[in-house]
Amino acid sequence: MTTLSTIWLFLITITAIFQLGLSSNVTTIIDDDNNNNNNNNNNADDFLEPQIETIKVIGNKFFECESGHQFFIKGIAYQKTRQEGEIYDTTKEPHYIDPLANPFTCLRDLDYLKELGINLVRVYQIHPNANHDVCMNAFAEAGIYVLADLSEPTISIRRDYPHWDTEIFNRYQQVIDSMSNYKNLLGFFAGNEVTNCQSNIDASPFVRAAIRDCKKYINQQGYRKIPIGYASNDDANIRKNLANYFVCQLDEDEDKGQEHLNSQADFFAINVYEWCGYSTYTTSGYRDLTTMFKDYSVPVFFSEFGCNIITPRPFTEVEAIYGSTMKKVWSGGIAYEYFEEVNHYGILLTKKDGSITKLPDFDTLKMRFHAATPIGITMDEATICEPPICSNSVIDDKSSSSSSSSSFWDVALTLPPTPNEAKCECLWQSLSCVVSEDATFDEEVALRELCFKVDCEDINANGRSGKYGRYSDCNPTVRTSYALNKYYEQCGKKQEICDFQGRGELLPNRNGGLQDLENKFSSDGQNCLSLLEGKEEEKEVQEEEPDVPGLPGSNKGKEVESTPKRKGKGKSKEKEKGKLIEEEEEEEEEEEENNKTPSSGEKSPKTSKSIAGGNAITFKNDSIWKTFIEILFTCSAAILI
């Protein structure tokens, strides 16, 4: 009896241990599943896209895409500038400050921006290689949109020496690539006060060309339709002319027949400082502006406002801008500005330790913005206004008193061509005497000097006559090198001529001229000889890599890619898209296979891993357990017998 009791006790103990182990493992599996689910939920929250509606243009109004409500801009200029003598790492940072690339400052400022009651910030300088995810997503969560300028101080269309070239276009493309995926990006400015008086109205065709080519680029990259417009100064002599010019329809716009590919501005903005102190709708000139734009075909708003002749500023113009009369014409405005600078327009002061102090203007502007609650029309009520055909009489608009001083709009209705980097790469390869890589000088000054000595028709661009040289779209270094090489050849290829007072150099293995280009190609595979002769024939891709030296940039120390277009993150070249899609589909199938519920007779990979990793006694399968029990019972029976 004692032996039998011992055997049965042994069997019960083994069974209990097994059940305890199985129970422990089941508990472990459940805990692991719960932890994994929690982790998955946390990861989903981390990558959850901010719920903010994109803004679109219909007629002369902005609208929220999903709700269909009219959108009024209540914004502030958000741009910090470097102080004189400021020390920073030039190898890692540009010479300007991108306020959306610094999470510390933008998250610090976010509470103040929300308190202010704004729904948009204007950023004048974007660093295209920086990551903007933290700031842009945080702003989106707070319901704040962004209007970004495409230019930066050293790469922009100059009013005194305008060109639309490869360097500027590359810059614009990079900014578009870096910002286009954010839903709270309202749009881009292609220029800011490029034309600011009658003497430089010939710079405006270059801005329209920029609008045209950026729209085309956005379409080619498959981005959503992002509005692109222009910010003008408030010169009473030309503001109506400029407004008419940027929205009228050119012949080339009619040929395209597609709104998203034309050169017309999607919106027009004005930097207005007419309302000072406790002015009025009439005395400030706001009434005249509103009358001027009452039938305008695209949205119009104040890209800057906030006269500071009287301080602290009462910002009484805010009530008028969003009032019953002006809201029918204007889509709001952007107060100038957030950061206190040397010009004393700021509403907050940044201290050296990074802390913020409110200035008196902050609370006043906050009060005005919170009191402004305009209600506009719905998307269904929007009216599409057909823009007029461009002509000097239409642009002059003699019915406007502000343009009476202008005899005529003496600017050609022909725009500069789209910059062709492949052509400029090939031109560079044809030159033997070029601007020295180590030289530091103003390209414009050098060109003025050289063009007194040689004919520069091929690199000149004239917005008044509408004549654009075949190489006028190349960057300043290539244009200057072209003129220097021409002078060098004209003077018998004397080395001292190429030296150009220490600013030029001879490149080895360059004979110069077109005869050297038959076996050279641009970075996109075009034959250089055909390209420069105007044939622009495509060359089949050869097994050997084409000889493509990098295209120089006009800013020394700045890396300039030789490819005609620079892709942004998240976007692949057309030839890579198919491969990427296949890889993504394979990854999705593999993920589904791993996460699917196991069918009868199968074991979940996750369950197997959890059991194997437990501390309790485990068995690989049920057959081993059954065999073990049978052996125990057999031994028990033998002992009893």
From Swiss-Prot:
Annotated glycan sites: N25, N621
MF terms in GO: 1,3-beta-glucanosyltransferase activity
Places the protein is found: Cell membrane
Signal peptide range in chain numbering: 1-23
Biased composition (Polar residues): 596-610
CC per GO annotation: fungal-type cell wall; plasma membrane; side of membrane
EC number: 2.4.1.-
Induction summary: Expression is very weak and pH-independent.
InterPro entries listed in its UniProt record: Glucanosyltransferase, Glycoside_hydrolase_SF, X8
Residue ranges, compositional bias (Basic and acidic residues): 571-581
Alphabetic keyword roster: Cell membrane, Cell wall biogenesis/degradation, Disulfide bond, Glycoprotein, GPI-anchor, Lipoprotein, Membrane, Signal, Transferase
Lipidation (GPI-anchor amidated aspartate): D622
GO process annotations (BP): ascospore wall assembly; fungal-type cell wall (1->3)-beta-D-glucan biosynthetic process; fungal-type cell wall organization
Region feature (Disordered): 535-613
Domain of life: Eukaryota
Binding site for (1,3-beta-D-glucosyl)n 1: Y124, N192, Y336
Membrane disposition: Lipid-anchor; GPI-anchor
Binding site for (1,3-beta-D-glucosyl)n 2: E193, D234, R239
Propeptide: 623-641
Database matches in SMART domains: X8
Active site: E193, E304
Family, per entry: Belongs to the glycosyl hydrolase 72 family.
Name of the protein in its database record: 1,3-beta-glucanosyltransferase PGA5
Organism of provenance: Candida albicans (strain SC5314 / ATCC MYA-2876) (Yeast)
Lineage of producing organism: Eukaryota, Fungi, Dikarya, Ascomycota, Saccharomycotina
